Design a protein with these regions (language model features):
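C-terminal and inter-domain tail/linker signature
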Residues: 1-141
């Protein structure tokens, strides 16, 4: 994929996260693609990826994910271990079951490997989990 094609792909991917339909997110992944969050156990396959996306959508019914920027190399430089770095921001109110109604705004990135069908073969997502937990309890302030 060219950088222009990847940028369009990234914009559509962010829109899928805003759709409240987890299958829309999973459709960006290869059939056996994987998604991990903060070095956790990867969700493998579209059904498992949809489950992860659905969890965020369930917890944040008003969730908005914005596409911030795209890079072609890893954040730490050197030989690229990925095809692209997708930077994003999530804003939403934790009003799902068990939620405390607090507004959350976090940013992070995903390291993408893209397959020959131009789908995500692997994504390793990262965000500041301590700040996320703090906002879940206390909100943005």
């Amino acid at each position: 994929m060219t950088l222009t094609e990847l940028t369009r792909f990234a914009k559509r991917y962010a829109e899928a996260w805003c759709s409240q339909n987890p299958e829309n997110v999973a459709a960006f992944f290869a059939e056996s693609g994987s998604l991990s969050v903060n070095d956790g156990t990867p969700a493998v396959g579209r059904a498992a990826i949809a489950e992860i996306a659905g969890g965020f959508m369930h917890d944040f019914p008003d969730m908005t994910v914005t596409f911030d920027k795209l890079e072609r190399s890893t954040p730490h430089g050197g030989r690229s271990a990925c095809d692209a770095v997708f930077h994003w921001s999530l804003t939403g109110t934790n009003t799902g079951p068990g939620g405390m109604g607090k507004r959350v705004r976090i940013s992070g990135y995903e390291l993408w490997k893209i397959d020959n069908k131009e789908l995500i073969a692997g994504s390793k997502g990262h965000f500041d989990s301590a700040e996320y937990e703090r906002q879940l309890k206390h909100g943005l302030d």
